[in-house]
Design a protein with these regions (language model features):
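Protein/peptide-recognition domains central to ubiquitin and immune signaling
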Residues: 1-20, 135, 145, 153-178, ...
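Soluble metallo-hydrolase cores and metallopeptidase-like ectodomains found primarily
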Residues: 15-50, 174-256, 268-271, 275-281
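Solvent-exposed loop/turn segments at secondary-structure junctions
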Residues: 31-33, 70-73, 161-165, 193-194, ...
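Structural recognition of the beta-strand scaffold that forms the well-ordered cores
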Residues: 63-67, 154-159, 186-189, 227-230, ...
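Surface-exposed loop and adjacent secondary-structure segments within mature catalytic domains
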Residues: 75, 79-112, 159-190, 202, ...
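Active-site-adjacent substrate-binding region
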Residues: 119-133, 137, 145, 149, ...
Length: 457
């Protein structure tokens, strides 16, 4: 019998040049059912080395199953979409332990497998050390795919451990590096489809799978581009308030909640300020970033070019002229407050700015930092960069990096509220007598010591 499988190719996957049918081979990358060691670079590298040694010369012409069976979760009793109530917002305001610098080396090779310890370490790492870790992590993954390509595999099937099942999360092979080799066709299947193929194989039924991946690589322009525009200020036009969101997204959906929603909110806030012809003492600059999903590349590059080197901490003249940066990238929900990034000096200022917005549900300030988006590029060099607290809706449960990230999950009312709040914050920052207070400029990073590691290829 024949049955369809639900899947999607990973970004920068190779193509098939038409339909390809082949037998499957089961070659799991990790020894256990829960590959927690995937998060640790040293362990991942060792697993890839072991995989290459064990499978060299054995996989030609096969469609390779890389993952073990994925247990599909019983549907949770928690709602798939939520809004913050007063209790949840109050929980966010509870004090957390301040970041205590942990011992780390650069380049970082290992992280704790225990989640709390790992999260604590990641919170203390300088942004450049953290992003360097994930870049090298991507390169180790890519070395696996390059090996499989060199072995002549017909394709690779995987699944993903996020979500309750039934949803596709297809991200990257890591092949976006300009010096990367071409990966084979790599597809992510829903857990149900993947498990079905693997069970047939385990029962000795020798299933055959047909895949057809149409992929074109264009290397004529390897650059990403930020989109930047300004509303000129008046008396202090050389000082700048920035707002922004990232323009890139993953491909299995349309990127509606991550992060077309943030771009739409930023653009609408910019339009409001322009249409109302409000007086602006400082210049207002909007930036829609590229390459956020590959490591905040657009915003990190912009900060390095205009404000400061995040390694040496050598500042440029513009560093002293940035009044603040406001980022929108937590889905399509209403704005409920601000993460202060441990900059308690802005609390009384933001409290005053939020007072007329309380009837819109903007009530909460938390001293906590939040991770994973472009305000970190500014915060990393001592600039006031902030991300808003937003109603979760179904962002983390269903749409984040998934095939469900479509227009249907971006409520217009939430986006309009967020745009009004963002416009108000930017207007206040542009006209405040003083610029926003800053945390101290971080110290320069120590010299990076490249490890003497052999390639796993």
């Amino acid at each position: 019998m024949a049955a369809p499988l639900r899947g999607y190719p990973r970004a920068w996957s190779g193509g098939t040049s038409g339909p390809v049918t082949a037998e499957v081979a089961f070659a799991p990358l990790f020894p256990g059912p829960d590959p927690i060691e995937f998060l640790d670079l040293a362990r991942l590298r060792k697993n890839v080395e072991n995989f290459i040694q064990a499978n060299r010369g054995k996989l030609k012409g096969k469609i390779v199953l890389l993952d073990r069976l994925r247990e599909v979760e019983v549907p949770s009793k928690e709602p798939l979409a939520t809004r913050y109530d007063d209790a949840k917002l109050a929980e966010l305001t509870k004090d957390v332990e301040p970041r205590v610098p942990a011992h780390w080396t650069w380049p970082l090779e290992s992280v704790p497998l225990e989640k709390e310890e790992r999260d604590a370490l990641m919170r203390t790492l300088p942004l450049e050390v953290r992003e360097d870790f994930w870049e090298r992590h991507q390169r180790v993954q890519l070395s696996l795919y390059e090996f499989l390509r060199s072995e002549g595999v017909a394709g690779v099937l995987m699944t993903d451990r996020r979500g309750p099942g039934g949803i596709l999360f297809a991200e990257s092979t890591g092949g976006f590096f300009t010096d990367a080799g071409l990966p084979p066709p790599v597809l992510v299947l829903t857990p149900e489809s993947y498990n079905r193929v693997l069970r047939l194989f385990e029962h000795g039924l020798n299933p055959r799978v047909t895949i057809d991946v149409q992929a074109t690589f264009d290397s004529s322009d390897p650059h990403g581009y930020n989109v930047v525009a300004e509303l000129p200020g008046s008396k202090k036009r050389d000082e700048v308030v920035m707002l922004g969101a990232h323009l890139d997204s993953w491909h299995s959906g349309t990127g509606a909640t991550d992060n077309a929603a943030g771009c739409a909110v930023a653009l609408e806030a910019f339009r409001i300020l322009k249409a109302l012809k409000l007086p602006l003492t400082r210049t207002v600059r909007i930036a829609l970033w590229s390459g956020e999903e590959q490591g905040l590349l657009g915003s990190r590059g912009y900060v390095r070019e205009h404000f400061a080197d995040p390694v040496t901490m050598k500042t440029q003249a513009e560093h002293a002229k940035l009044a603040g940066y406001f980022n929108v990238d937590n889905g399509a929900g209403k704005i409920r407050g601000v993460y202060l990034q441990e900059n308690g000096m802005v609390r009384p200022i933001f409290e005053a700015w939020m007072a007329p917005l309380r009837d819109l549900g903007v009530t909460t300030l938390t001293n906590r930092d939040t991770e994973g988006t472009d305000h970190l590029s500014f915060d990393a060099v001592g600039l006031p960069g902030f991300q808003f607290i937003q109603d979760p809706l179904d962002y983390r449960s269903r749409t984040h990096h998934s095939e469900l990230d479509t227009f249907d999950h971006a409520p217009a009312g939430d986006l309009l509220q967020a745009a009004a709040v963002l416009a108000s914050f930017v207007y206040d920052a542009a006209n405040r007598p003083e610029m926003l207070p800053r945390k101290p400029l971080p110290p320069a990073l120590p010299p990076k010591r490249e490890p003497s590691l052999s390639s796993p290829r």
